[in-house]
């Protein structure tokens, strides 16, 4: 292991009785050596290294011109009419590619700056890794230039939130502490990779002008159990490890209300699903957790618990036959193969075959594959065949060799939950048959008007109203002899109405019975959304009415 030369100190953590991690924060010298070896012996690893070096060369070839102000919330950057993502025509002109509407002024003008700041953050990481893997000093010098540039500017960037107000929860570089944290993690990792090339005065400027102030802004905004807090914990914890601050490390890991261990204990259900009930946010949370888990591992603090491992298992349990996640709640989740980089790390730490198979299902073109991935991975399908009940999370997947039906019946899921108790997603004949709407950019009015309405989901709405944000319950679950039966109840989502859905899957036959009971008279709409095109012999006329 490379000795600490320019930054040589050891911090003892009173709570853990261990030393601070090696100088490179998220990777050891031996892992860097192994990455070089993999690149020499395996073409895919060589391609990842070449791509990294190409990005570093691009950063080296561009002058460092940091934005004059912080960036804005990217969810603003969509057309209010049709939800399409805007195209940047100039710093003050942003055009919808569908309807041609042009947006000017704030918040639109500052959204491209969000992406520019993100590019500089990733450049610091890429330059640092490229320096460690090649030894080229000019790469470290460019990373240092970016770091010192931000150190000189960070506190002068106005504090601002999504609405342009100087409030807690906003950031200096970004418009919310979530994005400030996501931005800071690669920055502090990159700093640790080039730190020994900085003078003592330069290190002081980076740490006191950038890292500590950024951690302070993030810490001031306190959340509880939430995916955002997981990102904040990693950002603050990594700064703590990088600058040798025991208080920051302990807060990130052991704070009883919001630390890493609290997130595992209270944010992960006993089934392994993140409590927000969205597979997209489940994976987003996994992306937030690993940097702190790795930095702690190198400090001999073990955060790789059974509950943490369960986070990697739950998405496999709920996957549809093609690897897609059931599209429940905000940020529906995508395909398992898209999260293969996370499973590279999981397989490296736990060695479980199913994790390795998910990693093998990806392209292996990620930094995680190069830096942490095994040279060879197990092969084979991870698609589950048996029906499964996640009782605590409130999800079930009924499976036969021909059909899969996923149903959501339990906890609402907080702010990212949808009003869709007893919603089902179905898959058969090699394709989705029953669709969930998922979500679009949150700044688009259509997100609330349609995507978070009950009628947009495959369930029952009452009197044209949206369900209340209440939990449902399991009434019956039985899976035996090739037949699976599920019954769920939602008796609090509408006043005076009990909704009960029974699904029974036997081979290719899915029987679906929906009972609605009440002492009063109501209008019940039972929606089922399937892919297809509308054709009609009648003349159709567009009508503008509320959804």
Where are these regions (language model features)?
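Carbohydrate-active enzyme catalytic cores, enriched for enzymes
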Residues: 232, 237-243, 280-433
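Inter-helical turn/loop segments and adjacent helix faces that build the functional surface
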Residues: 134, 194-205, 243-247, 295-304
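Secondary-structure capping and boundary motifs in well-ordered enzyme cores
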Residues: 119, 176-180, 228, 256, ...
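Long, repeat-rich segments with strong aromatic
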Residues: 243, 247, 253-299, 396, ...
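Positively charged n-region of N-terminal signal peptides that target proteins for export
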Residues: 1-4
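Catalytic and substrate-binding regions of extracellular carbohydrate-active enzymes
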Residues: 359-547
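Bacterial N-terminal signal peptides
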Residues: 6-15
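Extracellular glycan-targeting catalytic surfaces
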Residues: 18-224, 230-237, 253, 257, ...
């Amino acid at each position: 292991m490379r000795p600490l030369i320019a930054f040589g100190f050891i911090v003892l953590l009173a709570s853990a009785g261990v030393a601070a991690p090696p100088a490179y924060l998220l990777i050891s010298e031996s892992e860097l050596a192994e990455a070089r070896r993999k690149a020499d012996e395996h073409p895919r690893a060589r391609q990842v290294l070449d791509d990294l070096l190409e990005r570093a060369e691009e950063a080296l070839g561009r002058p460092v011109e940091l934005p004059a102000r912080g960036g804005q919330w990217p969810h603003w950057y969509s057309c209010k009419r049709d939800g399409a993502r805007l195209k940047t025509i100039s710093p003050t002109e942003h055009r919808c590619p569908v309807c041609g509407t042009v947006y000017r002024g704030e918040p639109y003008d500052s959204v491209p700056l969000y992406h520019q700041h993100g590019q500089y953050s990733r450049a610091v990481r890429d330059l640092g890794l490229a320096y460690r893997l090649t030894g080229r000093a000019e790469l470290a010098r460019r990373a240092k230039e970016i770091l010192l540039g931000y150190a000189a500017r960070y506190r002068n960037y106005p504090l601002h939130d999504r609405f342009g107000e100087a409030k807690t929860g906003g950031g200096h570089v970004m418009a919310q502490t979530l994005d400030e944290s996501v931005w800071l993690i690669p920055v502090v990792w990159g700093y640790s990779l080039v730190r020994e090339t900085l003078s003592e005065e330069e290190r002081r400027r980076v740490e006191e002008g950038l890292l500590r102030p950024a951690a302070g802004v993030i810490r001031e905004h306190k959340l509880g159990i939430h995916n955002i807090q997981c990102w904040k914990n990693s950002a603050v914890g990594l700064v703590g490890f990088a600058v040798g601050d025991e208080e920051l490390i302990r807060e990130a890991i052991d704070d009883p209300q919001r630390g890493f261990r609290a997130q595992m204990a209270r944010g992960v259900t006993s089934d392994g699903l993140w409590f927000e009930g969205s597979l997209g946010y489940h994976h987003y949370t996994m992306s937030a957790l690993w940097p702190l888990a790795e930095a702690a591992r190198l400090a001999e603090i073990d955060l790789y618990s059974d509950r943490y491992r369960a986070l990697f298992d739950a998405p496999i349990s709920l996957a549809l036959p093609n690897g897609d996640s059931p599209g429940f709640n905000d940020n529906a989740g995508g395909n398992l193969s898209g999260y293969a980089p996370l499973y590279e790390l999981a397989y490296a730490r736990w060695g479980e075959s199913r994790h390795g198979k998910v990693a093998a299902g990806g392209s292996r073109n990620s930094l995680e594959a190069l830096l942490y991935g095994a040279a060879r991975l197990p092969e084979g399908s991870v698609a589950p065949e048996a029906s499964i009940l996640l009782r605590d999370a409130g999800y079930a997947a009924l499976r036969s060799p021909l059909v899969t039906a996923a149903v959501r019946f339990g906890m609402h899921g907080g702010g990212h939950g949808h009003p869709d108790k007893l919603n089902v997603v179905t898959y058969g004949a090699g394709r989705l048959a029953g669709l969930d709407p998922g979500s679009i950019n949150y700044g688009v009015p259509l997100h609330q008007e349609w995507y978070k309405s009950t009628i947009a989901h495959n369930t029952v709405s009452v009197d044209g109203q949206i369900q209340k944000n209440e939990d449902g319950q399991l009434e019956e679950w039985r899976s035996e002899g090739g037949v699976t039966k599920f019954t769920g109840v939602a008796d609090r989502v509408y006043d005076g109405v009990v909704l009960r859905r029974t699904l029974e899957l036997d081979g290719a036959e899915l029987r679906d019975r929906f009972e609605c009971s009440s002492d009063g008279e109501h209008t019940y709409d039972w929606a089922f959304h399937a892919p297809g095109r509308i054709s009609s012999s009648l003349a159709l006329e567009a009508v503008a009415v509320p959804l």
